[in-house]
């Protein structure tokens, strides 16, 4: 067992989280009920789900905003109810692509989404889920060009979106937590801005509040202990870069909690590829995944660690960081993580689902 007897330096009651929207939300394959059984075996107490603006609102291709927009609520409502039956809470990321009437080029997508339109979207969503969803985050991977552009303007665009979303959520449901960031881990030329570069440019000289910072600390090809070379990148091995930057921003009163504290970390996507050119082999993958969760647990700033995807997608899918096959057969990575979470629960390191 890789969990020490004392948890003095560990994140107290860290949540183990999971995301697989195609399985849990859209029910595109496998089956939601069976997926929840697997989630319980992993010790999951939190399920992250993306509420994609243009996908869930009716008439997203229209150039003019409808007076009374309609949304596809049912699959979210049923997911929340089923998750609650398993002692699992929902964390919802409110994100683009945006409908055509809300973008700078009047096309459905991620080009210059207007904060005023996003505010109304957030109002509708939070009003509907008030009292049933207790944690939101604003936009997915805003430092990645495929989620927000123009790329150079992304920090400023994101700040406007975040402020609109944060204020609306706190007005409607003051008890709900709001996370800022949802950043990807590394710079990728013109495709992706390094998360620390993005964070500093986004905050600037503002005075922002949040309940936590959400980040995706992937490092697909290397050990969780191997530090990335980019000084503004943040992988699982270099979380200290992010906690240091958040401490600096708190000290300067640029970004902090309402009570004046440094933002805690919510690691809302993580995993290693199950196949393809970035597959590391089953044994190494299982060991790396387990070590990644252990690193998160031992960081006192981390409140949540999320495995991204559970079930293998159909043949031909580009992204596969799943832990079980299409028929539910557990991989060595699944067994390793399940064993680790069981041990962590026993010593009080991670949150336990209520019974």
Model region roles, listed by residue range:
Residues 1-8:
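Secretory targeting and sorting signals
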Residues 32-33, 81, 115-119, 123, ...:
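Noncatalytic carbohydrate-binding groove/subsite architecture in carbohydrate-active enzymes
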Residues 123-136, 199-212, 295-303:
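Structural recognition of alpha->loop->beta junctions
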């Amino acid at each position: 067992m890789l969990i020490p007897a004392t948890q003095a330096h560990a994140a107290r009651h860290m949540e183990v989280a999971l995301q697989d929207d195609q399985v849990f939300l859209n029910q595109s394959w496998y089956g939601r009920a069976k997926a929840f059984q697997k989630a319980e075996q992993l010790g999951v107490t939190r399920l992250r789900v993306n509420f994609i603006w243009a996908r869930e609102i009716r008439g997203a291709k229209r150039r003019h905003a409808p007076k009374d927009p309609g949304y596809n609520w049912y699959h979210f409502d049923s997911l929340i109810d089923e998750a609650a039956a398993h002692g699992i809470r929902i964390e919802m990321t409110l994100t683009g692509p945006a409908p055509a009437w809300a973008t700078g080029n009047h096309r459905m997508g991620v080009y210059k989404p207007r904060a005023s339109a996003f505010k109304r979207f957030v109002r509708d969503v939070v009003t509907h889920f008030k009292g049933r969803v207790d944690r939101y985050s604003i936009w997915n991977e805003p430092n990645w060009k495929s989620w927000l552009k123009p790329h150079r303007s992304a920090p400023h665009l994101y700040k406007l979106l975040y402020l609109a979303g944060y204020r609306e959520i706190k007005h409607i449901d003051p008890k709900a937590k709001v996370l800022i960031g949802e950043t990807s881990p590394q710079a990728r030329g013109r495709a992706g801005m390094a998360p620390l570069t993005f964070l500093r440019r986004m905050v600037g000289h503002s005075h922002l509040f949040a309940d936590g910072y959400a980040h995706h600390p992937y490092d697909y090809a290397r050990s969780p202990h191997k530090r990335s070379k980019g000084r503004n990148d943040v992988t699982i091995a270099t979380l200290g870069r992010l906690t240091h930057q958040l401490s600096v921003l708190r000290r300067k009163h640029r970004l902090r909690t309402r009570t004046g504290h440094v933002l805690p970390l919510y690691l809302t996507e993580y995993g290693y590829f199950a196949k393809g050119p970035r597959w590391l082999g089953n044994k190494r993958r299982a060991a790396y995944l387990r070590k990644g969760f252990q690193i998160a647990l031992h960081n006192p700033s981390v409140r949540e660690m999320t495995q991204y995807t559970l079930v293998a997608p159909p043949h031909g899918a580009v992204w596969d960081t799943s832990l079980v096959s299409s028929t539910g057969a557990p991989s060595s990575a699944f067994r390793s993580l399940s064993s680790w979470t069981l041990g962590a629960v026993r010593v009080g390191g991670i949150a336990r689902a209520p019974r």
